[in-house]
C-alpha cells in the first residue's frame, strides 16, 4: 500500500511548522476508501510525527459516492478522520467555465471529464482531445508546460492508432501555423 502523492510543504504565514500533504486520487467507488484514507493518515503520522493533511480527489463516475470520514468507537474511546474531498464529476455541469479557466488544473479536469464522456465514441474523443490541444497552444504557456500537459492529455485520452496519427498531423499543421 502506497499513497498516491505525499508532499512536504511550508506554511505561508512564515512559521517553521511543516505539514505533510497526502493527496489520494480515487478513480472508482470503493467501500473501503475512507478506511484506507484513515490508515494512510495514521501510518504517515506514525512515520513522520508531523501534522498530516489528507485530501481526496474523487475521479469516479458515481454521483452520490462522497466519502469524507472514517472512525470508530470502542469501550468509551473514539477516533475519527474527517478529510476534504474534491469530486471531479461536480465540474461536469459547467464545462464552459473549465474551457475558459486559465488554470492547468481546469484543463486536466476537463480532460478527465471528456475522457469519461467519450468512452464509447473514439471520434468524439478525438474531437475533444484536438480542442484541448488547441487550448494548450492558445494559453501562452511555456514550451515545457505545453509538453508536460500534452503528456497528461495523451495519457488520459487514449486514441486508436489511426486517430492518433490524425491528431499528430493536426498538431504539425498547427505548429507550422504558429511559426508563421
What function would you assign to each model-found segment?
Residues 1-162:
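Conserved single-residue anchors adjacent to enzymatic active/cofactor-binding motifs
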Amino acid at each position: 500500500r502506497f499513497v498516491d502523492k505525499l508532499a512536504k510543504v511550508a506554511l505561508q504565514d512564515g512559521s517553521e511548522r511543516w505539514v505533510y500533504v497526502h493527496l489520494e486520487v480515487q478513480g472508482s467507488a470503493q467501500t473501503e476508501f475512507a478506511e484506507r484514507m484513515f490508515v494512510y493518515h495514521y501510518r504517515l503520522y506514525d512515520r513522520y510525527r508531523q501534522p498530516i493533511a489528507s485530501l481526496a480527489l474523487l475521479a469516479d463516475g458515481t454521483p452520490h459516492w462522497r466519502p469524507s470520514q472514517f472512525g470508530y468507537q470502542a469501550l468509551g474511546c473514539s477516533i475519527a478522520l474527517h478529510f476534504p474531498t474534491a469530486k471531479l464529476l461536480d465540474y461536469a455541469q459547467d464545462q464552459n467555465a473549465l474551457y475558459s479557466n486559465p488554470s492547468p488544473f481546469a484543463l486536466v479536469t476537463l480532460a478527465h471529464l471528456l475522457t469519461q464522456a467519450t468512452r464509447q465514441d473514439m471520434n468524439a474523443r478525438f474531437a475533444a482531445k484536438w480542442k484541448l490541444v488547441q487550448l494548450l497552444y492558445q494559453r501562452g504557456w511555456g514550451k515545457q508546460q505545453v509538453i508536460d500537459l500534452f503528456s497528461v492529455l495523451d495519457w488520459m485520452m487514449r486514441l486508436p492508432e489511426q486517430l492518433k496519427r490524425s491528431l499528430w498531423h493536426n498538431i504539425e499543421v498547427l505548429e507550422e501555423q504558429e511559426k508563421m
